[in-house]
UniProtKB/Swiss-Prot annotation:
Residues that, per the record, bind Zn(2+): 66, 69, 116, 119
Gene Ontology MF term list: metal ion binding; peptide-methionine (R)-S-oxide reductase activity
Active site, per annotation: 140
Protein's recorded name: Probable methionine-R-sulfoxide reductase B
Lineage of the species this protein comes from: Eukaryota, Metazoa, Ecdysozoa, Nematoda, Chromadorea
Cofactor or coenzyme needed: Zn(2+)
Length: 152
């Protein structure tokens, strides 16, 4: 089963219909405007089931933005097939301009979590096993945390 690809206008801040700093949005407000799976992953640091994300096999030209707030995260040029079960990118927009890295020692592992710098949504993790010809990094991102804006 593949998860749905959401449009920015259907979820997140745009649905709140108020001008607000994304970091000031209360969890109850996020819960009211995000589908359950998006809320679980983005706001509760969950993980979507591997190989089910709508962007795992998606390779159109464009950009990927945070589903919660619309901040630009990745360009399609940085996307590659990693076979890990989630969309993989070799670099983020502007060298983590809209991403925060956090040490994650949950589940008995040592990883680096990536979150949206604008709204603090959990996006996924970054690993050092990406393509050596680019950055050597692999951003492993949950599809449900992103929207896609096609390049014309």
């Amino acid at each position: 089963m593949t998860t749905k690809k959401f449009r920015m206008e259907d979820v997140g801040l745009s649905k709140l219909k108020v001008e607000k700093n994304p970091k000031d949005v209360k969890q109850t407000e996020w819960k009211s405007v995000l589908p359950n799976e998006v809320y679980r992953v983005a706001r509760e640091s969950g993980t979507e089931t591997p190989h089910t994300g709508g962007f795992n096999d998606h390779f159109e030209k464009g950009r990927y933005v945070c589903l919660c707030c619309g901040s630009e995260l990745f360009n399609s040029d940085a996307k590659f097939w990693a076979g890990c079960g989630w969309p993989a990118f070799s670099e983020s927009v502007g060298q983590d301009a809209n991403i925060v890295r956090i040490v994650d020692r949950s589940h008995g592992m040592h990883r680096t979590e990536v979150r949206c710098k604008t709204c603090d949504a959990h996006l996924g993790h970054v690993f050092n096993d990406g393509p050596k010809e680019t950055t050597g990094e692999r951003y492993c991102i949950n599809s449900v945390c992103m929207a896609f804006e096609k390049k014309d």
